[in-house]
Amino acid sequence: MTNIRKSHPLIKIVNESFIDLPAPSNISAWWNFGSLLGVCLILQILTGLFLAMHYTSDTATAFSSVTHICRDVNYGWMIRYMHANGASMFFICLFMHVGRGLYYGSYTFMETWNIGILLLFTVMATAFMGYVLPWGQMSFWGATVITNLLSAIPYIGTNLVEWIWGGFSVDKATLTRFFAFHFILPFIISALAAVHLLFLHETGSNNPSGISSDSDKIPFHPYYTIKDILGLLIMLVALMTLILFSPDLLGDPDNYTPANPLNTPPHIKPEWYFLFAYAILRSIPNKLGGVLALVLSIMILAIVPLLHTSNQRGMMFRPLSQCLFWLLVADLLTLTWIGGQPVEHPFIIIGQLASILYFSIILILMPISGTIENQLLKW
């Protein structure tokens, strides 16, 4: 009799994806983040489901319903903070995952990479809409400012913004539809993640050396299941430490003030994980130019495979490209810092220089360093 694990139509899929999957023998901890993202997604869907049972998407009661969850619902405060800080964990894992892909040349798997970019956009949209739901000051003004960016689109901009708002300002209709979208998008993300995995398993995983590992594969279980569980435990300890000791560390105090359309907060800023893109947006004094730069700061990932000039896949043996990669990481951290600062000297010029450097590294310096390294190998 055949093993049910290998014969049953449904269990067979799980088996081929998580148990008998041939994996490279040398993948490092940087390959843990895919599974961590899966866990983050499940955690967000579950906590979100329980929050949705008590939340009301009405401008009059949204803020009060969140307060009610924190005060009166059994462990409601914990579910709420798991959801809010779980989003931060999600983005930390996302940035690490994308960074790993850039460093080790995983972007040469074009289908997997492009679905990944689509996933990144969808997760960002979901997080933005989720931030609007508590209906605090930063929720309201964040929604107003970010949706207003679409008015920069020539000819249809203003109509588009009013269509998204469902009126002439961010109001009840906006909150209701944002809640509906925020609820449905994680399930779309789940489907996209399954497709992402499907395309990955067509080619097999990349590995740190960047060369084919077909001659040296090991089964995913138990080697990488145990490794993933270790990564998971570390992440959960970090998340629970954040929730139980400093749950509001990454939030904005302004969001504990109910939304008031008549009172603008002094510094409107998004959650920390959007600050790098927000800094790029603000560094261009023209509205349409800023919006284009904002979109391109993420869309640029789609052309990274086309800019790959090196004969080697990853950066493991490419010191020049390594320097540029870590310069890019430092630059993104600088942009994140600038995005949270007021628009005044010297922050304006720092933001503009960091934005120029960001695009220069990816579009100009990386391809040049790849070509130089090819020449160095010939010598």
From Swiss-Prot:
Question: Which Pfam families does this chain map to?
Answer: Cytochrom_B_C (PF00032), Cytochrome_B (PF00033)
Topology term for the membrane: Multi-pass membrane protein
Q: Which residues bind heme b b562?
A: H83, H182
- The UniProt transmembrane annotation reads 33-53, 77-98, 113-133, 178-198, 226-246, 288-308, 320-340, 347-367
Q: Name one GO molecular function term.
A: metal ion binding
Q: Where does a ubiquinone bind?
A: H201
Q: Name one GO cellular component term.
A: mitochondrial inner membrane
Report the subcellular localization: Mitochondrion inner membrane
UniProt KW Phosphoprotein keyword: no
Q: How is the cofactor bound?
A: Binds 2 heme b groups non-covalently.
Matching entries from InterPro entries are given as: Cyt_b/b6_C, Cyt_b/b6_C_sf, Cyt_b/b6_N, Cytb/b6-like_sf, Cytochrome_b, Cytochrome_b_C_euk/bac, Cytochrome_b_N_euk/bac, Di-haem_cyt_TM
* Top-level taxon of origin: Eukaryota
Annotated residues for binding of heme b b566: H97, H196
What this protein needs as a cofactor is:
heme b
PANTHER family cross-referenced by the UniProt entry = CYTOCHROME B
The annotated subunit structure for this chain is: The cytochrome bc1 complex contains 11 subunits: 3 respiratory subunits (MT-CYB, CYC1 and UQCRFS1), 2 core proteins (UQCRC1 and UQCRC2) and 6 low-molecular weight proteins (UQCRH/QCR6, UQCRB/QCR7, UQCRQ/QCR8, UQCR10/QCR9, UQCR11/QCR10 and a cleavage product of UQCRFS1). This cytochrome bc1 complex then forms a dimer.
- Protein family according to the UniProt entry: Belongs to the cytochrome b family.
What is the name of this protein? Cytochrome b
Organism of origin: Herpestes ichneumon (Egyptian mongoose)
Coding gene?
A: MT-CYB
